[in-house]
Amino acid sequence: VTSREVQNDPLTDIAPPTPSETNSIFWQKMEKSSEKATDWFYKLCVNNNYVKKEAIARNVVFSGTSSKGHGLEITINLSKPEKDPKAIAAAAHATGKKYPQCALCLENEGYLGGYGKNARSNLRIIRMNIAGRPWGFQYSPYAYFNEHCIFLDQKHIPMVINQQTLINLVEIEKTFPHYFVGSNADLPIVRSSSVVHERSQGGRH
């Protein structure tokens, strides 16, 4: 996370609707069409530069057919920036309670960021219920595929693959039938935010 990102993101957050206004407009549109609602929300996140379209354009995509005749696609994500040396040094000397707890927690919404911390002042998260639990829905700033979105538990709990995971995926698919949705592995060896915070991912393909 660079100082340029931390400085630029608040500037793109001046005109868009506030988080509460965003939720209100989104759910009004959901009453008519889930696809129109996500189209509006995605366009908002592109226009306020939370979804980094210019950076995403650098990604490399290989498409082809396997020996069995199945479609195959490999994506190399070149859009997500590496931490600069200052960010690494600042993170190494950080003390006290971690805030936000992880890159997916809801307190990232509106967070101004800093060295070693993601700039999220222009982040918008849609509040929703999945299988009776409060969850959130947002787009990934550095997408691997079209309209790459993240569904996350509003509570900071570790990811676990079980029967509830399948129930959640079905509930999400019913809510947004024009999107596909899947889940990461919950293997401890995978050192990423997908393990420390319960979530699923989806999008268009």
Task: Locate each region found by the language model.
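Hydrophobic faces of well-ordered beta-strands that scaffold small-molecule active sites
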Residues: 137, 181, 196-200
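Short C-terminal domain-edge/linker segments immediately following a structured domain
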Residues: 103-109, 169-170, 181-183
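A long, hydrophobic alpha-helical segment
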Residues: 179-189
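Intrinsically disordered, low-complexity Ser/Thr/Pro/Gly-rich regulatory segments
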Residues: 158-159, 163-179, 194, 203-205
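Active-site microenvironments that recognize anionic phosphate/pyrophosphate groups
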Residues: 1-161
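Histidine-centered divalent-metal-coordination microenvironment in nucleic-acid enzymes
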Residues: 146-153, 188-205
